[in-house]
């Protein structure tokens, strides 16, 4: 039986035509607070990175280690975001597409093709393909998912220092019972997404004394 890593590497070869191919993924579509972060990565075939996988199946420590390795070994990478204000103005889908586009445009090298995790594509001036579950199938998308996830988790840790009552360091902005209870008691902070229903309800309700 072939290992998960070898299967991932073979899938990368199957998806990647000759030339520079960028993998793109995002982190932070579902949370109630903070930006949505996207990353684009062009890997170096001469410097393979072992253990790439969908960021969600990796431990935080493993993601941090791979983050450093990706930044060191990739031909180039770019991380971008769409702000809370842009999410509330446009909606989370359009903000995600905006962050992905910014990440691709931020690459130092222009790819000949872009592979995007999911089933939708941002507007780009290069050929692109959406790949469902691409973060588990294509190495460059896996790398992008790790960069985006680590970047956003670090942002949540910083936000926790500003607003510890919400517990951002633990739930990363997702609508856990703890987070919803904190919203009910304390109301929303400036980094909460006003267009998301739980936050909107918290803003309409009187803050508990």
Swiss-Prot record:
Molecular function terms from GO: manganese ion binding; RNA binding; RNA-DNA hybrid ribonuclease activity
Cytoplasm among keywords: yes
Gene Ontology CC terms, in alphabetical order: cytoplasm; ribonuclease H2 complex
Residues annotated as domain RNase H type-2: 19-208
InterPro entries reported in the protein's UniProt record: RNase_HII (IPR022898), RNase_HII/HIII (IPR001352), RNase_HII/HIII_dom (IPR024567), RNaseH-like_sf (IPR012337), RNaseH_sf (IPR036397)
Positions contributing to a divalent metal cation binding: 25-26, 117
Enzyme Commission number(s) of this protein: 3.1.26.4
Reported cofactor(s): Mn(2+); Mg(2+)
Keyword list, A-Z: Cytoplasm, Endonuclease, Hydrolase, Manganese, Metal-binding, Nuclease
Gene3D superfamilies documented for this protein: Ribonuclease H-like superfamily/Ribonuclease H (3.30.420.10)
Family annotation (NCBIfam families): PRK00015.1-1, PRK00015.1-3, PRK00015.1-4
HAMAP family reported in the protein's UniProt record: RNase_HII_B
Protein name stated in the entry: Ribonuclease HII
Organism: Acidovorax ebreus (strain TPSY)
UniProt gene name: rnhB
């Amino acid at each position: 039986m072939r290992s998960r890593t070898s299967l991932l590497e073979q899938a990368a070869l199957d998806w990647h035509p000759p030339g520079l191919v960028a993998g793109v993924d995002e982190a932070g579509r579902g949370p109630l607070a903070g930006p949505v972060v996207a990353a684009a990565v062009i890997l170096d075939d001469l410097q393979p990175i072992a253990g790439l996988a969908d960021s969600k199946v990796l431990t935080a420590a493993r993601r941090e280690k791979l983050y450093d390795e990706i930044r060191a070994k990739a031909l180039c990478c770019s991380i971008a975001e769409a702000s809370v204000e842009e999410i509330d103005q446009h909606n989370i889908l359009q903000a995600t597409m905006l962050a992905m586009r910014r990440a691709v445009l931020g690459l130092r090298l222009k790819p000949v093709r872009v592979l995007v995790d999911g089933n939708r594509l941002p507007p780009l001036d290069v050929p692109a393909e959406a790949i469902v579950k691409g973060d588990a199938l294509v190495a460059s998308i896996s790398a992008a998912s790790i960069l985006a996830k680590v970047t956003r988790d670090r942002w949540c840790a910083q936000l926790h220092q500003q607003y510890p009552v919400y517990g951002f360091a633990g739930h990363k902005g997702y609508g856990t019972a703890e987070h919803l209870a904190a919203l009910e008691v304390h109301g929303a902070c400036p980094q909460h997404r006003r267009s998301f229903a739980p936050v909107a309800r918290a803003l309409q309700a009187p803050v508990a004394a």
